[in-house]
């Protein structure tokens, strides 16, 4: 069982449609959000004492979803006819790096809509084995 408390001072509340500009904490058990409240109220929760405390910088927001990506792309306008001639290993490594970029920008779910040969499956398998992090 994993218990974490994420704390910050700015959060986007998509349900209310507003930005909360005050100290806020989020109590999470495994992958379920248990409570979102003031740090004072969260610290009085019975799970707080055993929780890993994580201080966040920047804005806390719900995970973003990108429904159309091609992870193996270089992002520099390299045309498809060049990508098909590029070594699969290089494309897979580039795809892993692009997955990290997505995570760093707040994307927690994505759908890769096409990759050369088995490179997309290589990235997925590496993620499933815990070798790389992906959304």
Model-assigned labels for residue ranges:
Residues 5, 50-55:
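Conserved beta-strand scaffold positions in the cores of enzyme catalytic domains, especially
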Residues 37, 55-57, 75:
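Residues at the C-termini of beta-strands that transition into short coil/loop
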Residues 125-135:
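Alpha-helix-loop-beta-strand connector modules within alpha/beta enzyme cores
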Residues 24, 51-52, 107:
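Surface-exposed loop/turn positions
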Residues 59-126:
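Metal-associated gating/positioning segment near the N- to mid-region
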Residues 1-47, 60:
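N-terminal metal-binding scaffold of metallo-dependent hydrolase/deaminase domains
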